[in-house]
Every structure is written in C-alpha cells, then in structure tokens.
A protein has these predicted regions:
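Conserved C-terminal structural/oligomerization subdomain of aldehyde/semialdehyde dehydrogenase
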Residues: 1-3, 64-70, 95-100, 250, ...
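Hydrophobic face of amphipathic alpha-helices that form TPR/SEL1-like repeat modules
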Residues: 1-69
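Structural signal for hydrophobic packing residues in well-ordered secondary-structure cores
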Residues: 91, 95, 110-117, 121, ...
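Rossmann-like NAD(P) dinucleotide-binding subdomain of oxidoreductase/dehydrogenase enzymes
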Residues: 156-323, 448, 517
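Residues at or immediately preceding the N-termini of alpha-helices
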Residues: 63, 77-80, 99, 117, ...
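Residue-level signal for inorganic ion chemistry
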Residues: 66, 87, 102, 124, ...
Length: 541
C-alpha cells in the first residue's frame, strides 16, 4: 500500500507563528461584514444540479442576535424522493469514474474551500454561534478530511486487488478435497452501495458534513444531503458546501442538497428503499429510531452513525493540576458545551478535589460570554430554546439534589440570543444528570478515593465516545488505557481533556451507545464502511 502524504491545514496556528494575528482578525471581520450583506436572501434546494423550490420556506435566524440569516425551502417527502431518484440515476455513471479522478475532484474541492475559508468560517460563526477560532478550525478540518480521504483512496488503489495467475496456481493446485484444479484469476474489490442519505448536525455543519459526504462520494456513492433544518438550523453552511463542490467540478447529481423538517425529509431518507445507506451524526435516540424504522421493517441499509457522548475525565492525585484545569475547562465549556465530545463529568481524587475546584472556578470566572464574533469572547449563545430549557431544568435539578459551585445563571448581553454562564456542580454519581447527555455548559465534579472505582464510574454510562486522564503515574496510565471504554482517549492533554481530534492523527470513533461500526472518522478504516467487498473468480482453462 502506498503512503498517504497528508498534512493538516492549521490556519490560525500558521498566522500566529508568522506574527500575523492582526491580519487573521482583519480577514475574519471582513468576511463577517460580507456575510451579513447577504442576510435575508431566499435560497433554493439543488436536486440533480437544478434549482428546486418547495412553495413554502423555513426562516433561519442567527442564535447570536435573532437576525434573519435567510429563507430556505421547506422540502417535503416528495422532494426527498426527487433527490433520491436523481442520486440513483447519477450513481450509474459516478461509480464507474476512475478512483484517481474522484480523488482529484475532492483535492480540488479542498483547494476551493481553502481559498474561501474565511468566508465560510464567518457564515459558520453567524449560523451556529462559534467563535472565530473554532470556526476557522472547523473549516480547516473540512479541508483536512477532503485531502486525507483522497490520499487514502489513492494509497489503497481504489480498494481493488487482483491475484496473479501464478499465485492462484500455488493456492489451488491441490484443488478441493485434493482433486486437480485449474488456476483462477481472482479480483477482490470494494464496491459502492449506491445512494447515501447524509443527515448532518448543527454543531459541526462544515467539518462533519464534509467528512460524511466525501466519505460516501469519494468511494463511488452519490449523496442526498440534509443539513440541520428544524430546531437547530444550519442550512446556509450546507448550501456553501454544495456551491463549492460544484465549483470544484463535481458532476451534477452526485451531491443533492435538500432542506426541510426531519419528520418529512429526514424520515424519507431513512425509510426509502432507494437509499442504500445512512450517515448520521446526532442524538442516540434519533439514531436508534432510524435503525428501528429500517432493520425492524426488513429494510436493510449500511448505517454509519455517531450518536453522542457523556464523556468523562479522571484527575488523579498524581496529576499536574494546572494542565488538568486547562484541559477540563476547554473540553467542558468550549462552544458552550455543544459538542458530542464535550466533557460533562470529571472524577477527581479526594486529596486534590478542593484545590482543583478552586483553580477551575478561578479560570472559569475569567471566561468572557457574549457575541462570538468578538475576538475576545470565549462562550457564545446556546443554539436554541430547547437547549436553553434543558440548561435551566438541569440547574434546577442540581440545586435540588446536589451543590452548585459556580454559574447556573442566564447572562444579559444586550443581544437577543440565549446566553448562559458555564456551571460547575457536585452530584452523586447515581444522579440522572451524570448519565444523560445534556449538550449545555454544565460540568459535574465527583470525588473518588480508589482509582479503579474512578474508571468504573467513568465507564458506567451508555456512551463511549471520548475520555481523558491526568496522571503522572505510569501504573494509572496503563490501567486507564486498558480499562476505559471509549473510542478516543487523551492522557495528560492540557489543550483539552476530551475534544479536538486532529484528522490523520486521532481517529474519532464511538464505542457502546456512541457508535455502531467501531470505525472512526479521520482514520485509515473510515472509507471502507461506504463500500462492500466482492470476490470475483474466473477459472482459467
């Protein structure tokens, strides 16, 4: 197998290293002004390369201040069927495109996205409330996925292998049950399934959307893509992906963009027998419901799903507490806790718990909350009313059953968005909030005395996405590495305890209730999930 010569984009890091932070801020601020000029426009769906309107629209507002971002088509089941038919028709052509050409197209897409990175990042910040640093990092990740998967496809020669006649003769010379046999010419190839429905989340509408979509398309499948279109709307970033794919030369019909309620458009993608596979990132309940609707009805599909997390970290008595505080704060409160990899519970040895809490509260108090477009703001708004309600209800339960150590209040910013303080609390491990995914900036601190008990509690949830440890003790590191039930494990990582996977370096994979296939994004095994293996043997006379 050839080598994948891949390097990460790392835009902000490069600007800092070159002493150009002011230039970075200028480019981002200009892109924001440009993006706002387009606010209030009406947008189309794209099916088979054609603009399609639904007759009614969805109004998308920025979570920052309630400004109308745009009006998007309120697609129906019929529009989903149209998109599936268009994708199915194009599949007959796209699957036969040489893998080298497919790789070239998505390398071009990475280049086009890189040329537009600030414009796309600005739209992303306005649409879901991320800071400029998180937004540019997410666009970088989309670029990385495109280049990495192109490299993997090339390194694996399109996932096809042929057995030479001489090798075949050696293997089958004895034949079956000792009987003589002629040599066989054998080809083993991974073939695309067909049409994939890609159902994207609000929290990473660029990087995850690109990773899922390109995983399907680069391996020869076609896509019907539905961005988050209901409570948490991120439809404009999805449209930008569609537009940039076209600019990169992707044939019409390979990527079809539809918007509309999940109860109609999303459900049709799941139940329609013309869809051969589903790629989904979202809640566990939604993911399991999809599986029930398909496999339960005898409608088998390929399912590649990531279904959230309830991610733990352990802070040992042997930890560097400053590193632990830094990593815990970033993982728990970055993007207001609205990441599937966000840290939501931390188990701290009793001997250092009070010092850890004191240091954590001190650093948390310094975080600025407000308009994430401002360069000094760390925590922006919650994405929706439902997220705000979940935060308030959780704080009430903490006050009833535990101890609220810091935060828990709404924040007045002068904007119409939903802004809240990061909260730090103590609860018993058995409490429901310790086991339930919340997707808000609430961190539960739980003390422990025995390291084995800490690992046991960390594993005592339905999820298994990410986990972190802070310890300088080799025995504890070994015990944690061997015993933790999570697909992404970080040890002594000051930058973040549980978030921040880097394409090509870390795989991002969910165990237990967090995933299904056991293979993760940004890894050498991801693309294989979008294909099925076939062995073809031709006996030589």
């Amino acid at each position: 197998m050839a080598k994948n010569n891949f390097s990460n984009e790392f835009t902000y890091k490069k600007f800092i290293e070159e002493g150009k932070e002011a230039e970075f801020d200028r480019l981002f601020d200009e892109a924001v002004r440009k993006a706002k000029q387009g606010f209030g426009s009406t947008y189309h769906m794209y099916i088979g390369g054609k603009e399609v309107d639904a007759g009614s629209v969805l109004t998308e507002r920025s979570p920052i201040d309630g400004a109308v971002i745009g009006y998007f088509q309120k697609g129906t089941r019929e529009h989903a069927r149209m998109a599936i038919a268009a994708a199915k028709d194009e599949f007959a052509r796209w699957r036969d495109v040489d893998y080298k050409e497919r790789a070239r197209i998505f390398r071009r897409f990475a280049d086009v996205l890189a040329a537009n990175k600030f414009d796309v990042a600005a739209v992303l910040s306005l649409e879901n409330g991320k800071s400029r640093y998180e937004s540019i990092g997410e666009v970088d990740e989309g670029i990385d996925f495109s280049r990495y998967y192109a490299g993997e496809l090339e390194a694996n020669r399109g996932y096809a292998r042929k057995t030479s006649l001489e090798e075949s003769r050696q293997k089958v010379s004895a034949g079956f049950q000792g009987a003589p046999s002629n040599a066989e010419k054998v080809s083993i190839v991974m073939k695309p399934y067909g049409v994939f429905g890609v159902i994207a989340p609000f929290n990473f509408p660029i990087s995850i959307s690109i990773g899922m979509s390109i995983g399907a398309m680069i391996t020869g499948n076609t896509v019907v893509f539905k961005p988050s279109s209901s409570d948490n709307m991120t439809m404009l970033t999805g449209l930008r992906i569609c537009q940039l794919l076209k600019e990169a030369g992707l044939p019409e019909g390979v990527f079809n963009y539809i918007t509309g309620p999940g109860s109609e458009v999303g459900d049709e993608l799941v139940v329609n027998t013309g869809v051969s596979g589903i790629v989904f990132t979202g809640s566990r309940s939604t993911g399991l419901n999809m599986l029930t609707k398909t496999y339960g009805a005898g409608n088998q599909k390929a399912f590649i799903v990531e279904m959230g997390g309830k991610n733990p970290a352990i802070v040992s008595k042997n930890a560097n507490l400053d590193d632990a505080v830094s990593g815990v704060l970033s993982a728990a409160f970055g993007f207001a806790g609205q990441k599937c990899s966000a840290l939501s519970r931390v188990y701290v040895h009793e001997s250092v718990k009070e010092e850890f809490i004191s240091k954590l509260i001190e650093k948390t108090r310094a975080l600025k909350i407000g308009d994430p477009i401002s360069k000094d703001v760390y925590i922006g708004p919650l994405i929706s009313e439902s997220a705000y309600k979940r935060y308030v209800e959780s704080i009430d339960k903490i006050k009833e059953s535990g101890r609220l150590l810091y935060g828990g209040n709404t924040v007045s910013t002068g904007l119409k968005g939903l802004y809240v303080e990061p909260a730090i609390a103590e609860l018993r491990h058995e409490h429901e909030l310790v086991h339930k995914e919340l997707f808000v900036p609430i961190l539960i601190v739980i003390g422990y005395k025995n390291f084995a008990d800490a690992i046991s509690m960390a594993n005592d949830v339905d999820y298994g996405l990410t986990a972190g440890l802070y310890s300088k003790n080799r025995k504890e590191i070994k015990e944690f590495s061997e015993g933790i039930e999570a697909g992404v494990v970080y040890i002594n990582r000051a930058v973040s305890a549980t978030t921040g996977a880097i394409v090509g370096l870390h795989t991002f994979v969910g165990w237990k209730g967090s995933g299904l296939t056991g293979k993760g994004t940004g890894s050498k095994f991801y693309l294989q999930q979008f294909m099925r293996e076939q062995s073809i043997s031709i006996t030589q006379g």
